[in-house]
């Protein structure tokens, strides 16, 4: 059986966004106390088209380029290219779409939404395993080898009714659903392709849904908490 997880109070920290000039710029140094720019090595092997996602683990950067080179590339923190992870193509061990990735326990997990598969690699890019998913999703996170969190939308999962109307669900290593989170009331949401709704930082998984002023945390036990509320001075997202 699976559980429906209620949201409880967490830090409840309010972030005051301040006044933004829609005709001006939002400068990073006004929002962050530290900003570091890294020039990535530019060789034929290391070129990246668009940076869609970056994860930093153990003095290395892992850069996702979903549409140009369709790959995850590994660099040092100084920007030196190390290796590519994953292989785009039509073969049985290749990705047809590099939708998302995460890093867990010295493994890189690449999600292929098109095939509903997870490709598991070593940090050096050696393929270890391919797992078939019974549902479709557009983001993933792995707390441990037996604890996954997935993010998806209804449009792709009418064949899997137990997760319909939920944005998030938690499974074991066999992808049996244990918890369902972030309920979406029927007729009161839109099926849109959201990007980077899940993000991990300092061993905590965060969830931010589109057009919301609230950032939630999700624990390995499936507890979901309000953590941060963005004060937009009476305006609504995405105003």
Please provide the spans of the model-predicted regions:
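Eukaryotic scaffold repeat domains enriched in small/polar residues
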Residues: 1-239
């Amino acid at each position: 059986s699976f559980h429906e997880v209620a949201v409880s109070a967490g830090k409840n920290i309010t972030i005051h966004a301040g006044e933004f000039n829609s005709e001006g710029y939002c400068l990073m140094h006004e929002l962050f106390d530290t900003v570091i720019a890294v020039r990535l090595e530019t060789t034929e092997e290391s070129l990246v088209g668009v940076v869609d996602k970056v994860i930093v683990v153990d003095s290395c950067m892992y850069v996702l380029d979903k549409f140009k080179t369709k790959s995850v590339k590994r660099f040092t923190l100084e920007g030196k290219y190390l290796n590519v992870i994953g292989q785009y193509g039509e073969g049985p061990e290749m990705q047809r779409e590099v939708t998302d990735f995460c890093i867990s326990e010295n493994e890189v997990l690449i999600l292929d939404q098109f095939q509903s598969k997870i490709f598991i690699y070593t940090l050096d890019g050696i393929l270890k395993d391919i797992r078939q998913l019974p549902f479709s999703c557009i983001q993933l996170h792995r707390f441990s080898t037996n604890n996954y969190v997935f993010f998806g939308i209804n449009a792709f999962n009418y064949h899997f009714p137990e997760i319909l109307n939920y944005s998030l669900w938690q499974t074991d290593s066999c992808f049996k659903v244990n918890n369902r989170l972030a309920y979406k009331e029927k007729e009161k949401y839109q099926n849109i392709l959201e990007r980077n709704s899940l993000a991990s930082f300092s061993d905590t998984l965060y969830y931010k849904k589109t057009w919301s002023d609230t950032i939630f945390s999700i624990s390995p036990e499936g507890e979901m908490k309000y953590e941060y509320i963005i004060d937009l001075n009476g305006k609504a997202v995405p105003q």
